[in-house]
Amino acid sequence: MRRLGPLLGAAFVSVAVLVLLGSRRVVRVAVSGHSMEPGLLDGDWLIVDRHSRPAPTDIVVAWDPRASDRLIVKRVREVGTDSQLLLESDHPAHADEVIGPIAASAVVGRALFRYWPAARAGMVR
């Protein structure tokens, strides 16, 4: 019976992800690179809410202003009164790297949940 618990948990998460993806309110995004370590690792898959307004300390997915065909995953450092955002990495080696200001319209959404790998599944903070 103990083995059933993790299987039921994984099944619940899988169904929840499918329902959310079907609603088109959320999208899934893969983390690529090491700039958001230790919280997010290369290869993590995230559920991103496309309809939430970013706030300071949120982790967001945005179009990279340095390469407009690429998405980036970063933490919101600051939201200006003109809806311009400053983004930053979590990794200490990238501590002095600030991206922006970027328009709020360049933000795809706020990262809500890491669903893969299953062993690291949970809310994104």
Task: Show the residue positions of the predicted features.
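Extended hydrophobic leader/signal-anchor segments used for secretion and membrane insertion
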Residues: M1-R125
